[in-house]
Regions:
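Ser/Thr/Asn(+Pro)-rich, low-complexity disordered segments
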Residues: 20-39, 44-45, 50-53, 153-155, ...
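Polybasic, positively charged surfaces/segments
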Residues: 713
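Inter-helical turn/loop segments and adjacent helix faces that build the functional surface
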Residues: 561-568, 643-655, 717-731
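N-terminal, immediately post-signal peptide pro-regions of secreted/luminal proteins
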Residues: 22-108, 112-134, 141-154
Length: 885
């Protein structure tokens, strides 16, 4: 009976979510965010395994669905459902089930539907669905199946999993702004196949996920990336924040967690300023099992992933005794569900039980300097073992253990309230060019009544509907490692709605305010432009990064040659520039430009072949192992948008289109319907920015260095959508661009009032290399301050004004750059000076322009473009935040 009702409930939910265009929203009500998603709650002691949305059975129940229209029928003993077009018909004689409908639009915005029984409930108001069901265990073994249905927004999601080596396959599709750019296989005749193999071994991944697109630049990458030398010896953590987590290679095995902020270290101070800060990883808590000992090491498997996290299990070799966990950005608890294992919660510190007055709840002191709460459910009892460092169940345990650090004694009441709602994953849904949702997959009996407790980052709070802030006296506030204070939010719907409004600065190929005719004449821009176009051009750097810089440099000259304020109505210079650029580009179109691009099959991506020919993961800045693709390909995308805007009917434009769409798919594919590239390789909608580091392990986690090159990619994506008449790509690029700018202003470019980073680090004004666990005032290639700051300025572009406000530029210039020898000693041979002077022009144009006319140019910059952009920004410019992106 229970199984039948749940199947019908899932069928109802599937019928409804097959309709297109959910409109999800959040309301603030008693610190509860209310919005729209679908939950699959389960009792906290039960394991969560998914079941395919498609279902057939013999006996008393039958279901059918076909096509993309909301047409569906389901019938069973006492329950029937049918939908056709926009009509919904429900009837039920089951004494434990009830159904109601109102309105006539099952797929639109006005109708409502609810269904409930003793084991499930489903409701839909307008376009907002919500589903919950108690799970069941088909057998007493770990290989049993349980029903797990979730869907959100306009996407459809199905998950299937089982114990052992089978992987969860998650498929989600969405039209609108998250429609795939393309789905066809990259032609092998154009892109030869290659595989990283032993160059970058993959570990801890279920076999069912191998050979399919795998994310490469995510916070959890350290959990699946290794080197041949470290293959069986070293485990590196990942930073979900506020916790760091690890799958250890040595005892204690299991899910190891650390509250990083407790272990912060600053470098030695110079004039009161720190060069870096970082955090140790310490075994605060490991969710383990006594069976994981000696030779009985667990086998770790990541068997599913979402936009914001992964699902992992640790099993004995028999694959019948396992612990299962989901590791997700912002998770408030570290959670593990045990199946017939003797649970052991272990620490590096001596444990003391402070309070066990509530059954299934233990408050423990660790080493006298931190307090954690442990929830074990009502099954079994736990005691501290003889070592004094482990809280162990008295017998084999099937249930869920959840732990969290207590920032205050009052926090335990909040944790108590939300302890039975678990986060299992999360995905982004985009509703418009100004609004997106972070949708959390939730499991637990209290998700709809009390809600999900989940941590938000500082850049979320100003734009999160109904946000709980640190000013709320009941708020739980913990610290991330490098992104400041995190405030726990509550949602009964599993969805956060965030907005990025249109801004004040027009985003286009040209600066908002072009240089006046008088300024053009004063600077001699026409003569300078003619000289730059007549100069020797080449794409012969044998690097996708350096060649890309050259390409965008030359394309920018063609933009200037189309500006009537410089050239008047004469098209000759523009035609010369375009002809030269197009001739230069021809080897790129057939992938004969050195080094040729390969399609890499281990992860699914477009990579430089140089790493394979040289057998060097660092070749071409690590492009072959997925480093920096957004930097490298951003130049190609942006420059190609410039070319297409100026010469859309170029005879080889179709070939250029094909190459650029492949690059866009590699970096920013928005849909899992594309079977050849992972979703959003670099960009995180939770973090608001990209990660540059690829598939080799890093002790301090993923990192990002050049924020301006990050911005350049999404700027180019927006422009490419614009010139291609693809509104969805233009709008998605616009949203990502504005979100990226917000995150960069919050975390990377520090004005004096910045509270994200330690006060001793803020005077540096830029973070340098920004890791998950460390911020280092440095670059990968130079310790010079002009390089540390200059790498945040390239390429020179009108879009930089969106990120680099005049307030920031003034402080950076006054406090640091104006005092550097490269500036004070009138050094005109160091090419970095050209970048610093274009930047200075935003606050002191009169000083910068004369120097810029003589300065040696950066290799990605021409004097024409430098002067043109410097002349377009003046001290009168306010802290600019673009109006249309």
């Amino acid at each position: 009976m229970k199984l039948r009702r749940m199947r019908v409930a899932a069928a109802i939910a599937m019928a409804i979510v097959s309709a297109a265009g959910f409109d999800l929203s959040l309301l603030n009500d008693d610190d509860i965010l209310r919005g729209g998603t679908v939950h699959a709650p389960q009792e906290e002691e039960e394991r969560a395994f998914g079941a395919s949305l498609s279902h057939s059975s013999s006996g008393s129940d039958s279901f059918s669905a076909s096509g993309s229209a909301p047409s569906f029928s389901a019938s069973g003993s006492g329950i029937s459902l049918s939908t056709s077009g926009s009509a919904v018909s429900l009837s039920g004689s089951d004494p434990e089930a009830s159904f109601s409908t109102s309105g006539s639009d099952a797929s639109g915005n006005d109708g409502s539907l609810s269904a409930s029984g003793s084991d499930f409930s489903f409701s839909m108001s307008g376009s907002t669905p919500s589903f919950s069901a108690s799970s069941f265990d088909a057998s007493s073994s770990a290989s049993g199946s349980e029903l797990d249905f979730s869907a959100s927004g306009s996407a459809e999601t199905s998950t299937t999993s089982s114990a052992g080596s089978d992987a969860t396959t998650t498929t989600s599709g969405s039209g609108g702004l998250l429609a795939p750019f393309a789905t066809e296989e990259p032609p092998e005749t154009l892109f030869p196949r290659n595989a990283l193999g032993e160059m970058a071994p993959i570990i801890n991944v279920a076999k069912g996920l191998l050979g399919k697109p795998l994310p490469t630049n995510k916070w959890w990458g350290n959990l699946i990336h290794t080197t041949a030398e470290e293959l069986n010896t070293k485990a590196n953590p990942g930073w979900s924040n506020p916790y760091a987590v690890k799958l250890p290679k040595e005892a204690p095995y299991g899910i190891q967690a650390c509250y990083s902020y407790n272990y912060r270290q600053l470098s030695a101070l110079t004039d009161g300023v720190a060069e870096f800060y970082l955090h140790d990883f310490v075994n605060d808590i490991t969710l383990s099992a006594t069976e994981f000992a000696g030779e009985a090491k667990p086998i770790y498997e990541m068997y599913s992933f979402s936009d914001f996290g992964i699902k992992v299990r640790a099993c004995l070799e028999n694959k019948q005794q396992c612990m299962d966990s989901a590791l997700v950005h912002g998770m408030a608890f570290i959670t593990a569900t045990y199946d017939r294992l003797t649970a052991s919660i272990e620490s590096e510190y001596t444990m003391k039980i402070v309070d066990k007055s509530v059954p299934g709840k233990y408050i423990i002191d660790l080493g006298g300097n931190q307090t954690w709460v442990v929830y074990t459910g009502n099954d079994g009892s736990f005691t501290i073992d003889e070592s004094g460092k482990a809280l162990v169940s008295s017998k084999p345990f099937t249930g869920t253990v959840r732990v969290a650090i207590l920032p205050s004694s009052e926090a335990t009441d909040v944790y108590d309230k939300y302890r039975t709602c678990h986060v299992r994953g999360g995905n982004v849904s985009v509703t418009s060019r100004t609004e997106y949702l972070l949708q959390w997959e939730t499991v637990g009996k209290s998700c709809k009544t009390h809600g999900l407790l989940h941590f938000a980052l500082p850049h979320h709070l100003p734009v999160l509907k109904g946000a709980i802030t640190a000013k709320n006296p009941k708020a739980i506030v913990l610290n991330s490692a490098t992104r400041g204070k995190m405030v726990a939010q509550v949602t009964t719907t599993g969805a956060w709605t965030l907005s990025e409004a249109e801004n004040d600065l027009e985003v286009d190929f040209y600066p908002t305010t072009k240089p006046s005719a008088k300024m053009v004449s004063k600077l001699g821009l026409l003569k300078t432009l003619q000289a730059d176009i007549a100069d020797d051009w080449g794409l012969n750097k044998t690097s996708w990064y350096f060649n890309g810089k050259q390409y965008q440099k030359y394309a920018s000259l063609c933009l200037m040659a189309a500006d009537v304020a410089i050239v008047g109505k004469n098209k000759k210079l523009l035609n010369t520039c375009l002809s030269k650029l197009e001739t230069l580009l021809e080897p790129f179109l057939d992938n004969t430009l050195a080094p040729p691009l390969n399609y890499e099959t281990s992860y699914g991506g477009l990579v430089s072949s140089q790493g394979f020919t040289a057998n060097d993961v660092d070749a071409d800045f690590g492009n072959s192992v997925y480093n920096d693709h957004h930097y490298h390909y951003g130049y190609w995308v942006t420059a190609s948008a410039m070319l297409k805007s100026l010469h859309p009917k170029w005879k080889r434009m179709k070939e250029l289109d094909a190459m650029i769409w492949i690059m866009l798919r590699d970096v920013a594919n928005p849909s899992s319907e594309d079977a050849f590239f992972p979703k959003f390789r670099h960009f995180s909608f939770y973090l608001g920015h990209s990660y540059s580091h690829g598939v080799t392990p890093m002790a301090d986690g993923k990192d990002e260095e050049s924020t301006s090159e990050d911005v350049n990619f999404y700027y180019g994506m927006k422009l490419w959508g614009q010139v291609s008449n693809n509104k969805a790509v233009e709008d998605l690029g616009s949203l990502m661009l504005r979100l990226n700018a917000r995150a960069i202003r919050t975390y990377f470019l520090m004005t004096s009032d910045n509270t994200i980073h330690p006060k001793e680090f803020v005077p540096n004004h830029v973070t340098g290399i920004f890791f998950d666990n460390k911020a280092a005032y440095a670059t990968w290639f130079s310790a010079e301050k002009y390089a540390i700051h200059g790498i945040q300025m390239i390429p020179v572009s009108p879009i930089n004004a969106m990120v680099r406000t005049t307030e920031f530029i003034q402080q950076e210039w006054d406090d640091i750059l104006s005092k550097e020898p490269i500036v004070t000693e009138a050094n005109t041979t160091n090419a970095w000076l050209s970048l610093l002077l274009v930047n200075e022009a935003a606050v002191d144009q009169a000083d910068a322009l004369p120097k810029l006319k003589k300065a040696t140019m950066d290799d990605g910059l021409t004097r024409s473009w430098a002067l043109y952009n410097a002349a377009a920004r003046s001290h009168s410019a306010k802290s600019q935040q673009p109006r249309r992106a």
